[in-house]
Amino acid sequence: DECLKYGIEPLVTMFHFDLPQALAEKGGWGRRECTDAFVRFAKVLFENFGDRVKYWLTINEQNMLTLVGPLIGTFNTEGVANIQKELYRQNHHMMLAQARAMALCHEMVPGAKIGPAPNISAVYPASCKPEDITAAGLFSAIRNWFYLDMAVHGVYNHQVWHFLEEQDALPEIQPGDMEFLASGHPDFIASNYYSTATAAMDDSTEEADPA
């Protein structure tokens, strides 16, 4: 109300790295129940603020939660056998929560706009060598396009899906998941942009080594 009083248009981020402690203690985004809890939370937000807030961000920098969660303190690796698999399981649940929240926003607050807020970084090949160009394309898919393809089109990026297969990190896809993912359509993409990146092929392994 104070923002509107002074002519400031509020832009609300629904989730910014921190879960309620009760949910975190139950496993957080690693459990599907967290997806349902987020949708209930979204409903409360839209019911109470939808008449005044017209712009919503779903999950802040979801790709950072997945790519560097252990480094930024949003994921505890203790006792986790396959860290990659657990991170991408959490990511799948967040994607479901985001899609359902976007669909709910359009249903409950038709005039509102909602979208994701990934951390996007332009990725350049370290040289003009074909293998470095390939490495840059793969890293960009893992770093950027995976999250954009899912948010906008509701599908898994094929390059990243293949990467997850190789890493034994594929998430569990339950019946109805892909329909949920396809039902959420963003009105915009909010990009948090801090830096560019380069990528080169690791000659020792002949695999893409993001730098």
Task: Specify the residue positions occupied by each region the protein language model found.
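Active-site region of glycoside hydrolase catalytic domains
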Residues: L4-A211
